[in-house]
Amino acid sequence: MNIMDYENSKRFRRNKLEEDNISDDEMENEEWDEGFGAEEFISFDEELPEYDENNPTPTCFSRWFDTQKYHYHRKIPLPIQLPKEDKKQPKQHPLKWAKFTDETEIESTMVVIGKIPLTRKRNVTNENVSFQGVANEIVVSKNIEGTKKKRNYAFTTYKNKNKKITKPIQNQLCFSITKGIECPHYSCTYIHNYSQIEHCQYNNQCRFALQVDDELYLQNNNGKCLKRHMYESIESYLLRLEIPIYNCTSLVLQVNPHVHSDCNILRRVLQNAKNCRVAPLIWQKKKVLELKTSDDSDSENNDEDDDWKIDLF
C-alpha cells in the first residue's frame, strides 16, 4: 500500500483523531506560568515595540498578560507607574541669611521689602469748642463724616503747649565708670576717662558754670554744662554735675583759705556732695608761698596739722 493510499484510508484518519484528542487533553491539564512558556501560542507583531513595565502603552504581550490576569482575578488590572525617587537638593547653610559667608559673596546692595502706607486725610467740619474737663485741657467735639468709627474720633484733647516738661540732662560717662560694671556697648562712644571730656569753648566765662576757685566750679543759672572748663579738677566736675561714682568713698578738694571760710560756697558744695553719695568730704587748704621770718615759721609748723585737712561730716 502506498503512502498516499494509507493516508486516505479510514484507519489513518482514526489514529490521527485520537492523537489530536490526546494532545488537546494534555494541553488542558498542563499548568502554564504567566508569561513564561507561552511563546509558541502567542503571535508577536513585529511592528509593536517590546514590553516595558514603566510604559503603560499596550503591546501584544501585555494584552495576553491582561487577559490571563482577568481570568485569574476576574478583573482587568490598571497600569501603574512606579514612583521615581526624588532628587535630594543640597541643604542650605543655616546661617546663609545672616551673610556669614566669604567676603566675596557679601552683597553691598540693600533690598527693602514692604510698602509705606499712605496716611488718609480726614475732613473735619463743624467744630464745637467747649471748655470742659481739666483746667489745662480743652475738649473739642468734631462731627466727622464718611467714617465708621465716629465715636473714637468724636472728642479730642489739646493740652496747653505753654508748659513744657523739662527732661533731665544725662551725663556722658559710661556705665563702666559710674556703676563699676563691664561696658555693655559693642562700640562705646561714651567717656571712659576724664581726659576724654571735651573742653568748653567759653572756658571760665560759661554761664552754666561759676568759677569759685582755681580748680573749683559750681552750678549756675539752673543749667548744666557737660563739658570740662579751664583748670577744672575731676572732683569739681563730679560735684558740679552730681555724678555718683561706685567706688568713691571720700573726696578731697584743694581750695584756698578764703573759699573755705565762705558759708554760701560751703553749703552748696555740701549739698552737691550728698547728691553724689560721697562721705566724707575733705577740704584741703592750699599752701601760700610767702617770705616769712624764722619766728613765724616755728609757730606755723605747730598749727599745720590741724588746718591742713578738715573733715566736714
Swiss-Prot record:
Zinc finger (C3H1-type): 174-199
Acidic residues composition bias: residue spans: 296-313
Stretch list, region Disordered: 294-313
Database matches in InterPro entries: Zn_finger_prot
Gene Ontology MF: a single term: zinc ion binding
Keywords: Metal-binding, Zinc, Zinc-finger
Keyword Nucleus tagged: no
Family of the protein in this entry: Belongs to the IIV-6 077L family.
Name used for this protein in its record: Putative zinc finger protein 077L
